[in-house]
Amino acid sequence: AIDFLRRVNLGETPDIGPAAAVIGGGNAAMDAARTAVRLGAKVTVVYRRSRDEMPADDEEIREAMAEGVAFRFLAAPAGITGQGRAEELRVELMELDARKKPVGTGRFETIPVSAVISAVGQKIDLGGMQDIATGSGGRVTGPERRPDAHRATSQRCGWSRRRTSP
C-alpha cells in the first residue's frame, strides 16, 4: 500500500481497473482504499478479523465507509486468479476463537477484482529520521503536552524527540 500511495502522491495514476481489493485493516489500508475509490475503482477492504479488532482509527474507517468502500470482515486471502491481471481474489472465511484469534472455516468465496493492494505489515522508510523515538506500532512518542500558540503541531502526529543513546 505504501508504494501505491507514494506513486499517487507523486502524481502518477496507477491503472487499478474497475474493482480493487485492499488486504489489511490498518490506517494504510484505509488510505489505500480511499485513494483507489478516488481513482474510480469499486473497493473492498478484506480483513481477517472482525470490525472490532481492526487497528485503523475509527475516524479513518468511518471516512472510508462514507466514500463507498465496502468491507469483507472475517476473510483471509487464499489466492488470486487471472490472465495477466488479477480477476478474482479467493478468500477463506474465518471465525474468531475464544481468544479472538481468526481460524479458517474451510469455506471460500471469490471477490471479482482487477487489482489487489496489500496493506499488511507496512513499514515506512524513516530515511534520516532514525533518531526520532517511536513506541508501539511505530508511532512517534514524546512528552505529554499540547502545542501552544507558538508551536502548533498536528494533534495526530504529537511531539517528537530524539532517542536517548543506549
List the predicted regions and their residue ranges:
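N-terminal Rossmann-fold NAD(P) dinucleotide-binding loop
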Residues: 29-30
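A Rossmann-like FAD-binding core segment of flavoenzymes
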Residues: 3-17, 38-137, 141
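Glycine-rich Rossmann-fold phosphate-binding loop(s) that bind the pyrophosphate
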Residues: 24-26
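Short FAD-binding loop at a beta-strand-to-alpha-helix junction that anchors the flavin cofactor
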Residues: 20-22, 143-166
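Gly/Ala-rich phosphate-binding loop of Rossmann-like dinucleotide-binding domains
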Residues: 33, 37
